[in-house]
Design a protein with these regions (language model features):
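A conserved catalytic-core segment of Leloir-type glycosyltransferases
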Residues: 46-110
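N-terminal subdomain of nucleotide-sugar transferases
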Residues: 1-67, 392
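Conserved catalytic-core segment of nucleotide-activated headgroup transferases in glycan assembly
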Residues: 188-190, 195-251, 257
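Short hydrophobic beta-strand element within catalytic cores of glycosyltransferases
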Residues: 296-299, 306
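Acidic donor-binding loop of glycosyltransferase active sites
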Residues: 268-282, 295
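A charged, aromatic-enriched C-terminal amphipathic alpha-helix characteristic of glycosyltransferases
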Residues: 329, 333, 337, 346-380
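Donor nucleotide-sugar binding/catalytic pocket of nucleotide-sugar-dependent glycosyltransferases
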Residues: 158-191, 209
Length: 392
């Protein structure tokens, strides 16, 4: 039986620094490697890299522009995956949405895929997804975020993938949704540093929902008591302004900020990774990637983070009042478990070696690429029948 998969997502393909986009691109490559005829129809919506234009991004991917379209349409390949994209504006607009939706519907009719892969719940994709199902395709929606608590988001979906038991339970409790839990697709060669020289305590993406407030409290105390511990913050242009607005960060003598780049470069200079997320994180990709590099991640006890690290990370509490909307710093006492753990692992070589070994071991058990690739392929070739998407 000929199997084919079309990823339809009103987002930029494999956007740098965007875990969801990178995961979906990896998943497509896995399916292509298993014999699926794989293609993607994407757009110009960039979510995590405000300094990157879609033209620059598509040029880096080696895509070619077609003449005569109302907006630029580009085509090319990502290895075995055929790519076509509309260079819409980086934010949704009616004209771009309509053009993208029409092109997606054309692709469905032309390619007649056996499977549609999608994420983001974009309304302009509704007609294309409905047409695919009418032609017998199976629509698989992957949930990367926590906001999809309306059954209407899944109106044209046959099966749903979530990335943690936490997220599966949350959606089941909110809207009665049945889903299959699988980790996001992650390529080890794309994230594992070749020649690591770990020197930094690293914090990635200093946004409110990622924990900039508890991070600032830790940085302030480290500046007073342990200024010898260098801190690296990985931040895009828009996030740098948020950092500059926090007086607590001005005192640290060894706090460096760098833009998002190849994750292997970041993990290659990271000794400990901070993930003090106050929000209910659906998974925690950076924590998993850190463990692949033998870097102990220090993660909050919120959402799917404890699940993502298993026995390979250190799960630490945040004060109950602390949410992503908090506008005051937690006290030293409230953040002491974090501070004490950082200092212990920084100073005690034996303790660090034990934690690093646990990270390596857990990542191999949880995220071995060969096993995850096979599990993904098995999921897509399963002919069913499948349980109802929603509980009665």
């Amino acid at each position: 039986m000929r199997r084919s998969v079309l990823m339809a997502a009103h987002r930029a393909y494999a956007e740098p620094g965007n875990g969801a986009a990178l995961s979906m691109a990896t998943l497509l490559r896995w399916l292509a490697g298993a014999g699926f005829d794989a293609a993607a129809i994407t757009s110009g919506l960039i979510e995590q890299a405000p300094d990157l234009t879609i033209v620059q991004h598509h040029d880096r991917l080696g895509l070619r522009r077609q003449a005569g379209a109302a907006r630029a349409v580009v085509t090319g390949h990502d290895g075995p995956v055929a790519l076509i994209a509309v260079e819409t504006d980086r934010r949704p607009d009616p004209v771009g949405d309509a053009q993208y939706g029409a092109l997606a519907a054309e692709m469905v009719t032309a390619r007649r895929p056996t499977h549609i892969l999608t994420y983001g719940a974009d309304p302009c994709l509704g007609p294309a997804l409905a047409a695919a199902r009418a032609l017998g395709a199976q629509v698989v929606t992957v949930v990367h975020a926590a906001g999809y608590t309306n059954r209407a988001y899944f109106q044209q979906t046959d099966r749903v993938v979530t990335h943690s038991g936490f997220m599966a339970r949350f959606l089941a409790s909110q809207i009665g949704l049945h889903s299959t839990t699988m980790p996001p697709a992650m390529s080890w060669p794309a994230v594992v540093a070749r020649d690591p020289d770990p020197v930094f305590l690293t914090f990635i993406n200093p946004a409110a929902h990622k924990g900039i407030v508890p991070f600032a409290a830790l940085a302030q105390r480290l500046a007073r008591e342990r200024p010898d511990i260098p801190i690296l913050v990985v931040a895009s242009g828009g996030r740098v302004a948020a950092l500059a607005a926090l007086p607590a960060l001005a005192d640290h003598p060894a706090l460096l900020v760098c833009p998002p780049r190849d994750p292997r470069e970041i993990y290659g200079i990271t000794k400990l990774l901070l993930v003090p997320t106050p929000a209910a994180e659906p998974f925690g990709r950076v924590a998993a990637e850190a463990m692949m590099n033998g870097i102990p991640p220090l993660v909050s006890d919120r959402g799917g983070l404890p699940e993502a690290v298993g026995a390979g990370g250190i799960v630490l509490p945040l004060p109950e009042w602390l949410t992503h909307a908090a506008d005051r710093l937690p006290t030293d006492a409230e953040m002491s478990p974090w501070f004490d753990t950082i200092v212990r692992l920084w100073d005690d070589d034996a303790a660090y070696a034990t934690a690093s070994g646990a990270a390596h071991q857990a990542s191999a058990a949880l995220y071995d690429e060969t096993r995850q690739r096979q599990r993904t392929v098995d999921y897509f070739i399963d002919p069913g029948p499948f349980p109802p998407l929603f509980a009665p």
